[in-house]
Amino acid sequence: MSGINSRNQKMEQQRQLMEAYIRQKRASPGMVQASDLQINRPMSGMRSNSRELHAYDGPMQFISSPQNPDQILTNGSPGGINPVAMNTSRNHSNNMRSLSTINQEADLIEEISSHELEDEESSPVTVIEQHQQSASHSANSTQSQKPRARQHSFSDNLDEDDYTNRNVAGAAPVRPAGMASSPYKDATLDGSSNGTGNGTGGESEGDVIGNIDQFVMQPAPQGVLYKCRITRDRKGMDRGLFPIYYLHLERDYGKKIFLLGGRKRKKSKTSNYIVSCDPTDLSRNADGFCGKLRSNVFGTSFTVFDNGNKESTESPRLDLAVIIYDTNILGFKGPRNMTVILPGMTEDDQRVKISSADPKQQGILDLWKMKNMDNIVELHNKTPVWNDETQSYVLNFHGRVTQASVKNFQLVHDSDPEYIVMQFGRTSEDVFTMDYRYPLCAMQAFAIALSSFDGKIACE
């Protein structure tokens, strides 16, 4: 009994130290994590091999030794009856308490080790409990009987159970084919008004059409979702400070198609990224040069340009997007706030041509500052939901994001916050997912993601 009591005291001390460590980690700036992760997912091989649990909770648990759970006591009495089993009312309850303490310690160790693998920029985040998801689903199903705006999942290939088990963060809608040119018009929930009538809005996964250099600049067709993956290459002499980013379009059976590559220029007063569809030549003079991303001094505002010439009148340089991050001078904790301004769309789903290099017209940023919204579209990142139970910010990425990070975001329009124009998030140390749809093109979406990678003096 004295051995068990001393063991319990040690366990209690270790548990208090671990809880203090967790509270200290949670005091750092908040991050955003996907709220649709599996609650009881298996541990990775690295963590399971580094931890050894000496516990047995099977039907023969009552014959385990309290000092060494791996040892099975033999029958020592002449009648073949185990002397430990004769006192089951006391020793069995003691063993149960000991095993319960060990399991609690194991859960705390697993939680600590999982925090060390998360994004080092902010505090750990957990997932929403299953009963909260069910409560949210029942409320949504009651309201869905009335006609309202379309609310469909971002991942249309999920089965019915995955789609209906939405959490409180809300599910992203799917834009059906054949809708009006504006992506923010209301539609019926089942999509039958547009002839789809399949319950998922008829949205399909996009594929490359035509040449790569033309495809990456063309706005996504309505009713098409492009699922992409961004990999960060930090290997080499100077790629620790100037990594190269590669954008691939995901296809079936693990296949992928290269779309764009991006690199930060070394000799530049401000952050300046070159984007090219040629992965072997990421320079302004390359044939595959598609455009660039340029920031201001503080890293709070980014402008996306195409490959046009600023001095040319025949093919002037066009503004593709402006990304603005809210300043955080006082150091308030929480996720980032960003605003994305895009050129408006014409009736034939083409971008309005806006050039800040043309002295006869104003650029996207100037139009936005003057509140002239006739030819521009303003998007915002979807506000994450704060979960009091898990003490974390959560968003529903529908299985596309698996790690917490301050870089995780979803872009929506104020008139239809359920239509996810773009979402971006971390899946591993140097791998990120990027999904986009109308009215974005691959060049715009990739540049927005690059702005999230760049360091921001006044935002962190």
From Swiss-Prot:
One annotated GO molecular function: lipid binding
Transmembrane segments: none
Residue ranges of the region described as Disordered: 75-97, 115-208
UniProt-listed Gene3D superfamilies: Tubby Protein, Chain A
InterPro entries per record: Tubby-like_C (IPR025659), Tubby_C (IPR000007), Tubby_C_CS (IPR018066)
A Pfam family this chain is assigned to: Tub
Subcellular location(s) per record: Cytoplasm; Nucleus; Cell projection, Cilium membrane; Cell projection, Rhabdomere
Gene Ontology biological process terms in this record: endocytosis; glucose homeostasis; negative regulation of opsin-mediated signaling pathway; protein localization to cilium; response to sucrose; sensory perception of sound; triglyceride homeostasis
Residue positions, PTM Phosphoserine: 153
CC annotations in GO: ciliary membrane; cilium; cytoplasm; neuronal cell body; nucleus; rhabdomere
SUPFAM superfamilies hit by this protein: Tubby C-terminal domain-like
Tissue-specificity statement: Detected in sensory neurons which have a ciliary structure such as the chordotonal neurons, Orco-expressing olfactory receptor neurons, labellar gustatory receptor neurons and in the femoral chordotonal organ (at protein level). In the chordotonal neurons of the Johnston's organ expressed in the proximal to distal cilia, with lower levels of expression in the distal portion (at protein level). Also detected in the salivary glands and antenna (at protein level). Expressed in photoreceptor cells (at protein level). At stage 9 expression is detected in a subset of neuroblasts.
Ranges of biased composition (kind: Low complexity): 130-145
Predominant location category: cytoplasm
Effect of deleting the gene: Viable and fertile however flies display a decreased climbing index and extracellular sound-evoked potentials are completely abolished. This hearing defect is likely due to the abnormal localization of the two transient receptor potential channels iav and nompC, as well as eys within the cilia. There is no localization of iav to the proximal cilia, and nompc which is typically found in the distal cilia, is localized to the proximal cilia. Also eys displays a much broader expression pattern.
PANTHER family tied to this protein: PROTEIN KING TUBBY, TUBBY-RELATED
Stated role: Functions in regulating protein trafficking, retinal maintenance and lipid storage. Protects photoreceptor cells R1 to R6 against light-induced retinal degeneration by stimulating norpA-mediated endocytosis of the rhodopsin ninaE (Rh1). In the auditory receptor neurons, functions as a cilia trafficking regulator of various transient receptor potential (TRP) channel components including iav and nompC. Likely to deliver pre-ciliary vesicles containing membrane proteins such as iav and nompC to the intraflagellar transport complex (IFT) at the cilia base.
Entry text on domains: The C-terminus is important for mediating light-induced rhodopsin endocytosis.
Family: Belongs to the TUB family.
Name this polypeptide is given: Protein king tubby
